Amino acid sequence: MATSSSAWLMFSDHYPEILIAIACFLIFSLLLSARSSSEDSLPYNWPIFGMLPAIISNNQFNDFTTARLRKMGWTFIFKGPWLLDMDYIFTCDPSNINHMFNDNFENYPKGELGKVFDIFGNNIFNADGDLWHDHRKMAQTILWDGNYRTMQATFIRNKMDNALIPILDSAACKRKPVDLQDVLLRFTFDTSCFSVLAADPESLTMEFPPVPFSKAADQALDAALTRHITPRLIWKLKRFFNVGSERTLAVAWKVIDSYIYDKIAELKAKRKLVGKINSYDAVSFYMDNFNIHDDKFLRDNAFTYLLAQRNTQSLTMTWLFYALFENPKVELKILSELKSIVDESSERKFNDGFTLFDSNMIQSAIYLHAALCEALRIYPPVPFEIKDAHKADVLPSGHKVRAGEKILFSPYAMARMKGIWGDDCLEFKPERWITGNGTLKHEPAYKFFAFSAGPRICLGKELSFTQMKMVVATIIYNFHLQMVKGHVVEQSNSILMDMKHGLMVQVRKRSVM
């Protein structure tokens, strides 16, 4: 008995150290297993932890998910930690996406996921039901208005004239590399601020000034991603105690609110001073056409418009240029098309020897449009999205969905499935978007998901294409860009498909055409 008691006392003295050692061993084993997991198998479903260690230890979530979806026939069940309601259905099956966004649309509202993105407030992004219908009708009125579109096109042309071309020209003359992703993000931030708030922040200048709003917006989206992979109870506790990613979000939120509310106040003050002005920005539209003057309403909608325009357009153009660096023959075809357009155009615009493309000139740029579609297919700005099931359901793939269960679907993975896009799915091939008659080929939205699908399909799709074509055409026609030798292009693990290290390029002026 004495020996037994002594042994127990010895063990109890070292009990904490033993527990820590066991915990460290388990964590190390989990991470090692997760990293060595074969692409031909699902992540190991550990007791307590589920498959989460495989996600946490992987720095390329989109490729990790794609490999598993390919092996498992486009859909699989992801098991989260026990008792934390973190099980997901992962899918890239077009029939499942069509089911959620079209056939059974009402069963997959924003619902609880709106709380994850509460920084957007009560707007078209988070709304459901009648409120969403009201928001969508107002957004349609704004985005399809001729004056609004003309104002945007004019400002974009002026911004190219006064900022984009001078900066690229300076980089060419000085032989100084520039981060094209940063240039395009600044460009679209300036243009989106003008179209939404009638204000030009002038972030795209030779000095490349800090842009607190843009930094805060990126931090807010990263915090939202953290909420997705964190048990709801945990991130709510972090928010309550104001720590970690929730503290970062709170600080970013204040920066975002300060900027937008200040711009709304400036616009209202200007209107009060000079009376109603002929401005066709989104905020003025809400006040003039819908008699909505509530600052919170205007803030929520302004933030959504700003992010939608700034992020999706800039990232699409950035990835397009990366694809052109990898496929120079495609760039030559675009250049040839643009030369034909310029030769036939009576509306050629010059700026110190540079040619500017306006919204009329680029309407016939079919091959450029196809190249943008291909960039959106392979590099979707939003590589994955998540839906909540309101009621129990069965997906076309045969997978049962519990009420409240989350479904993650991946447009990024969809683009990489031979059964969806053919054996050449990994190739950057604009020709897949052009018919035998030389017209653009239509693909159903649940297959080409860059602009969403069903009743929630993006209202600004054609406007976005027009604006991107103006910018890309002007850059390609006037400059030859090359990626800096040795520069590494890597996706960020983010809600958005941005480049972790940017896109560093050398710029040369093209010879006179």
From Swiss-Prot:
GO biological process, one term: alkaloid metabolic process
Name the UniProt record assigns to this protein: Noroxomaritidine synthase 2
CDD domains reported for this sequence: CYP86A (cd11064)
InterPro entries, per database record: Cyt_P450, Cyt_P450_CS, Cyt_P450_E_grp-I, Cyt_P450_sf
One GO CC annotation: membrane
Function: Cytochrome P450 that catalyzes an intramolecular para-para' C-C phenol coupling of 4'-O-methylnorbelladine in alkaloids biosynthesis, including haemanthamine- and crinamine-type alkaloids, promising anticancer agents. Catalyzes the formation of (10bR,4aS)-noroxomaritidine and (10bS,4aR)-noroxomaritidine from 4'-O-methylnorbelladine.
Membrane-topology descriptor: Single-pass membrane protein
